[in-house]
Structure formats: structure tokens, C-alpha cells
Amino acid sequence: MQNLTYKILEKHLLKGKLEAGQPIEIKMDQTLTQDATGTMAYMQFEAMGVKKVKTELSVSYVDHNTLQNGFMNADDHAYLQSVASKYGIYFSKPGNGICHQVHLERFAKPGKTLIGSDSHTPTSSAMGCIAIGAGGLDVAKAMAGIGYRLTCPKVVEVKLTGTLAHGVSSKDIILKLLELLSVKGGVGKVFEYTGEGVKNLSVYQRATITNMGAELGATTSIFPSDEVTREFLKCQQRESDYIALSADEGCHYDETVEINLDELTPLAACPNSPDAIKNVSELAGMKVDQVAIGSCTNSGYEDLMKAAAILKGKKIAHNVSLVVSPGSRQVLMKLIENGTLATFVSCGARILECTCGPCIGMGQSPKSDAVSLRTFNRNFYGRSGTLSAGIYLVSPEVAAASAITGVITDPTTLEYADEFEKEQSYIDDSLIYAPSKDPEHVEIVRGPNIKPLPVNTPMDSTIDKKVVIKLPDNITTDHIAPAGAKVLPYRSNIEKLSTFVFENNKPHFDEVCKENNGGIIVAGENYGQGSSREHAALAPMYLGIKAVLTKSFARIHLANLVNFGLLPLIFIDKSDYDKIDEMDELKIENVNSLYDSLDLIVENVTKNETYKVHAPISQEDIDILMAGGALNYIRNQQ
């Protein structure tokens, strides 16, 4: 008897045993990239010398860098389109939609495996597949036919009972889990949803939950493939992709969490973390300045129809700016077709294109000290583009209700009709381009912003560097390598991007690294949580960072550090963290001894102290680190 997670993993297992905590390697059927991480991923794929992708399906999406206020983003898009055409990859044009929304609608299949260069790739697991977010280099390796290495996860059963009440959303289910478990509560785990309550959730509702499983730090989340899945695929004219998949009755789970949907109330994640949860009723009456409905979490057909039901026939409050961004062109066309877009426009909403937009700080930054309600998945400090703004994560129902009243409002207190026409999808794949049938004659387009890929040098046997920055718990990849309209255009230019590293924590960090010939980073718990962007490892590598010493790491960032040859270490005695100060000189000798033991000694030369540390890596990771990163390792193997 097996749970659903292990059923799919077993069919794709290349190496290892399905035992929690053990290293395994699995075959990936599909890949996806988005443009902010995709340019680097495809440059890495090119460096491997493979003539065509070896996956069943690979798709390149453009949904991040669509604010084209200079040549850089357009150049990147031209590069991505030419690479896709040459190497056997489908290309989704700007405006076609957010990668996760479009992939769920048009490509995700039950029972398959998917790896994507975006941390919210698990959105597609709502379809009953294993979808995992990773760094771009791991995605490039998958396209080259190389298996994906990970630690075999524990499987947590999330047993749902009951039915969501009027005004309560699937967003509230995942916010409840975050309240119970925190942003690091899912590290090393897959969350598998079971119970009678699952049958009452549509695929779009399930996708909201699997999407924000990333905020738990989970490897992925998964729902069964059932009649609800079949109906969704039928609407997408893809019923032939359906297979029934579920866990065996009486199968083993490492943990079980029970949630009664009948008892849930609307929730909000308060600034500046997705697990800072309060009941909306506790926040009711707080003045609101901005409301944003959209993102890969809540921009599906049903979410926007529910928001429109609350807004219909009303006007937004005079103090509120409301923006709405549909998740895909398919959804937008359906809203035009049934008149719902007119509802949004007439109430005073501003309609944005089908992209990530405000969720990644790409426009719509709120005013100073604003309260902004967003149906997004992250509210990290500074992510909106306004450092002083307070960002609250809420459901579309809470967002719409609050836009009308001008204050945070519990939608369960309002009367509105939330029954709407069953979706009959508007299917038009004309903005998804198939790869060329004549790839030999396709020329790669490289604009001046696309700089050569920086490559690390082999690991030294002794690391002797200063601590160039010391950081607290829960540092995100947004802290390390910020996003937003100012920075994202340079994701293909690591030299320029490196000047923004830690700019909100330590301005001119890049200059400190240059003055000290690189250095070591020291941090607290859950270092590198959030986005899968490998630039948070690649840019520090470019600046000469050789090791990162923390209390613990987030899963994807740990893998990215190894991929780029930065030595990850954790304190065996976490209190040693308090003994280290910025600019202390740390020496790590006999790094080659990792082959014999994953434990090392760090000498604090400045304070004449020593600390025991552990490298949370596998034997193959050691080979990669010693080579100076995965690209060097792959080249050495050829």
C-alpha cells in the first residue's frame, strides 16, 4: 500500500530508495521556465552541448519581465524565443499568461513529473502530478536528460473534511496550514491532500493550495486525480490526458494534519511573512489603500468570478486603488465573453495584462506607509517595491469586499451571489509556438545585455575569509537577490546584478566583497527561503563568496549553493551563531576531508575560537563542490 506521492516517485525513480531522508534521483517528464530565471537556465543548457531537449515536454514562458522600459527585457525575450525554437521547446509569448496558470490549463498531466525554474511550480500538482520548483541549472540538467537529485521527502497527509462556507476560500486553507506549521514547517516534506473535503474543491481551488505549499518550504504538495480533475480537463479539451490516481486505502503517512473546512473563517497573512496569520475579523476596520487581485495564486476563472460577484453594481472606495490581473489569456477572454471584465472596469478597477506584475514588484508599488491587500503568495519586506508599505495576503473575496468598503472587511458579513456559470474554457493556443522543424537553421539572438555565464573555480582545500555579512532568521532570496522593475532586467547580466545583492540589508555589499576578496556569509534559520532564483547563489559566487554558514537552509537554495560551488554549512551547536561578528576572520581547513566525514571545524581566527559544523550534502554534492559547481562537474564527466 502506497501513498500517491510515492506511487509517482516510484515510477520515476532512477537511483536510491524511497525512504524519507535518503538521497534519490528521479526522471523528469516535463520542464517549465519563466523569463526571469529562464535566460540563465538556457545559457546553462547551451553550455552542456545537447542538441535537443530530452524531456517529453519543455515550455518557456514569458511572464515576469514584461515592463519593457528599456531594450534589456525585449532582448531577453528574443533570446528565449530563438532558443526555444532551436532546441525543441514550446514558447509562450508575453501576454499569454503566468507560467503556472497556463501550464495547469494546457500542459499538466496526472501522474507526470514536472520541474520548473520557479518556486511555485507545485501549482500543477493540483492535477495529481509531482511538480517541483528548482534552480535553473537543475531544470537545464533535466532538459539534458539528467535525473533530478533530492532528499526523499516525508509525506504529510492533510485530511480535509466538510465544505467551505460562504465567503471562505481555498486561500484560507493554506493560510491555516501556514499558521499551524510556519514557513519552515514543510521543509523535507510533501503535503498530500485526502478526505471528503477534497471532493468539494475544484482544480483551481486545489491549485491555490499547492501553489502556496511553497511558502511552507515544502518539496511539493499534491491532490488526487479524480472526477473533479476529469471535468477540468474536459473543459480544457484535454480529457484524453486524464487518469485516475489516488493513495491506497490504509497507506502510510509520516504525519497527519486535519482541517475541518466547516470551521474555517477568512484569514490574512500580515506583514512581513506568509505565516503571520490573523483572522480577518480581528483586522476588520483597518483602512486600506490598495487592493491587488491576481498572481499565480488567485488569478483563475473562479477566483475572478467570485471577486466580481462582490463588486458587481458597486464602486470601489475613494481611498482605494484596485488592480486586477487575470492569470491567463484564456481566463481574460472568458471574462470578456461573459461580461465580467465590464464589471471590473465599471467598479473602478484597473486591468493589468496577464503576467506576474505587482507580485514580483513589477509595477503597482503602493504609496508610502500604505496598507495593501493582495491575493498573492508572498509579502516579504520590500517585495512590493515600497519598503514602508504593509502587505497583507488575503483571498479574492476579502480583497473585493475591502475594495468596496475601503477598510478590511470580512466577506462572510456580506450578501452576494457566488454562483456563476460553469466554465466552458476559451481555448486558443495561438500564442504558444511549437519549436522549429528545421532547428539547424535557427540562429540564437543575443542582445548586448546577455553576458557570458560566470563559472566558479574548483574548491580550495582551505577557505580563509572574513564574514562579510551576518543575517537573522528567515532571510529570503528576495533579500539576497532582489526582484522588481529596477533589478529584474539584469538577470542575464550577473556582473550588473551582483551590485544589487543584499541592497536592502547592507548597501554596497558588493564593494565590501571586492575590498575583502570575497568572503563568508553567516545567517540564522531557514536561509534562502522563498523564490527558487538561482541568482541568489550565482551573484554571491561572482562576488567571491566561498561558504555560507547558517542554522538551517531552505531546500531549493541549498541545492543552488551546491550547483554553483558555494560550501553550505550548518552549526552543530546553534548557539555558536551568537559568537560570530561581521568581519571576523574564519578559516575552514581540510575541506577535502568531506569525503570522509561531513563534519568540519571552523576556526574563528579573530576570536581564537572553534565551531563544529556539518555539511548537509550528499556524496555526489561533494564531487560537484570540489569541481566548482555543477557545470564544471558535467563538463569533467564528458
Residue map of PLM features:
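Fe-S-dependent hydro-lyases/dehydratases of central metabolism
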Residues: M1-Q638
